[in-house]
Amino acid sequence: MEPDLQPIPESDEVMPWTIAFEDVARNADFDFNDAVIKLMPDPKKELCTVTVMAAGSKARMYLHYDGPDGDQNLGEIHELLGGKSTEFINTPMSIVSTPFVEVGSVKWPKGYNVATDAGRFYIEIQRGTCEECTDMITLADSPGKMPQALLVAGEWKWPKEGTHIFSTYHIFPYWAKDATKVNYWGWYGSPTSGNYVTY
């Protein structure tokens, strides 16, 4: 396999970043589309714009940001997209049908960078009607842990509903096994046709 030697963006560069969350605790299909958000950090303005893009779970999912002012609940993912938690939004078809929603901007102080601070965004999942029956979905905080969320530089085409990420991105399992190998850093550059959502 030829190495992908695309330049790796600086973590404080003004560019979009995508976080894709997967509820691995319950009914995991490993499509990494249960909640998809886009971040646009602007270090000069010390702000990060947050956009909600997709909801591929029928559980109630609350987007949180643990920033300089403490933990903020930014809203329920389906409701932010104008839908209900009983439906999939922008995951069943090959092209999005619901417009993305810019939630707003959160404080992003100097010293924050995506590589170390994207994990400040996480999903709280509420099970049924029990307000205390919740799980958290976060980016891995150390190597070797089962990924519950992926951080991708730039715009990302997430797998369609029920499509395993391995079927959409064939290099992904190699990257997941050893993310230090340059050969696999561009795993998200060549999705399998028909298996992903475009916009």
Language model feature labels by segment:
Residues 1-199:
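Extracellular distal adhesion/interaction modules in secreted or cell-surface proteins
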